[in-house]
From Swiss-Prot:
It holds the Pfam family DUF2112. This is Uncharacterized protein MJ0404. InterPro entries: Methan_mark_5.
């Protein structure tokens, strides 16, 4: 079982596919779920502690907008933990939290720099493309299992 970083990082579709093939998806839902249930947090919906902004400084300089640092405080540790990644290109804005272009660029840069197996797929626009997408993801995840056995 490999830990698979998913981009967009809150895609339920990609999360489900990764789980179905026996791997652990690394997505924002996991991180935010832990923060929401954390008794230290006094003021939901902010869902952060004093430590979160400091964590973001590891991935983005202080001059970078605070929203980028805040997002990277959550996304950065997922990238560090990842053993492989699935990146969906050309996804519509409603597909995941991909509205901040600076965070997107930094996220994809950190994934590439990590030098892990990466599958880049295009968002499907019809049923035939969706079937091809699922097959590509299935083959990628199976290849990770085969490489692990060797």
């Amino acid at each position: 079982m490999k830990k698979i970083f998913i981009y967009p990082p809150n895609s339920l579709i990609l999360t489900d596919l990764v789980e179905r093939f026996g791997h652990k998806p690394l997505n924002l839902n996991i991180v935010i779920g832990k923060l929401v249930r954390n008794p230290e947090i006094d003021s939901p919906p902010m869902n952060i502690t004093d430590e979160e902004p400091k964590k973001g400084l590891k991935y983005a300089a202080v001059e970078v907008p605070s929203g980028v640092r805040g997002r990277m405080a959550l996304i950065g540790p997922l990238i560090e933990e990842a053993e492989a990644a699935i990146i969906m290109d050309d996804a519509p804005i409603a597909f995941g939290c991909i509205g901040c272009q600076r965070t997107n660029e930094l996220t994809l840069y950190l994934v590439r720099r990590k030098n892990i197996p990466i599958l880049r797929v295009k968002y499907p626009t019809n049923e035939e493309e969706a079937e091809i997408l699922v097959n590509k993801i299935a083959n990628f995840l199976k290849s990770l299992e085969e490489n692990q056995e060797n």
